[in-house]
Amino acid sequence: MAEAASISQGIAERYATALFELSKETGALKTLETDIDALKDVLAGSPDLGAMIASPVISRGDQAKAVAAIAGKMGLSPLMTNTLALMSEKRRLFALPQVLSALAGLIAEEKGEVTAEVTAATKLSAAQAKKLAETLKAKVGKTVKLNTTVDESLIGGLIVKLGSTMIDTSVKSKLASLQNAMKEVG
């Protein structure tokens, strides 16, 4: 299974690099970024679309028609539309989520940004998110973009993952540490 994941990641990185370089050459990085965000939103909101791109049962022709219709309806750039058509023709649409993630990473790197994965017990307010982004920016020296998710099981606090660093200030982890300490004592 790990081998399949690395194969699809390799495919995704090749498509992402090619699309990124072409967009950079033509000065269309902002358009590409808009397309990526739109596609991520559509994939997140449509389990049927996710199933369609992952299904080996659906023919190339049907996938190509569906992708062309979706791209047209969304108003995606010609470069993204052509890339989706090529991926459909080559039966590589299953790697689309990884392509989008790799593209977002390349664009962020180009802009000097890093992305922090933040898991909070409750939804962060705009002021809290801004303060956290500023604090992380001071720490890493780059603009920080936050991807936030809510996990009520944390009880309180945050878990921040930035690159290979993880900061866990959640009540859940504090309670687990206390529980382990109590087991050692008694």
Curated annotation (Swiss-Prot):
Annotated GO MF terms: proton-transporting ATP synthase activity, rotational mechanism
Primary localisation category: membrane
Upper taxonomic lineage: Bacteria, Pseudomonadati, Pseudomonadota, Alphaproteobacteria, Rhodobacterales
Alphabetized HAMAP family for the sequence: ATP_synth_delta_bact
GO annotations of cellular component type: plasma membrane; proton-transporting ATP synthase complex
PANTHER family xref list: ATP SYNTHASE DELTA CHAIN
Organism listed in the record: Fuscovulum blasticum (Rhodobacter blasticus)
Pfam family, one: OSCP
Keywords for this protein: ATP synthesis, Cell inner membrane, Cell membrane, CF(1), Hydrogen ion transport, Ion transport, Membrane, Transport
Function comment: F(1)F(0) ATP synthase produces ATP from ADP in the presence of a proton or sodium gradient. F-type ATPases consist of two structural domains, F(1) containing the extramembraneous catalytic core and F(0) containing the membrane proton channel, linked together by a central stalk and a peripheral stalk. During catalysis, ATP synthesis in the catalytic domain of F(1) is coupled via a rotary mechanism of the central stalk subunits to proton translocation.
Protein name (database record): ATP synthase subunit delta
Keyword Transport: yes
Oligomeric and partner information: F-type ATPases have 2 components, F(1) - the catalytic core - and F(0) - the membrane proton channel. F(1) has five subunits: alpha(3), beta(3), gamma(1), delta(1), epsilon(1). F(0) has three main subunits: a(1), b(2) and c(10-14). The alpha and beta chains form an alternating ring which encloses part of the gamma chain. F(1) is attached to F(0) by a central stalk formed by the gamma and epsilon chains, while a peripheral stalk is formed by the delta and b chains.
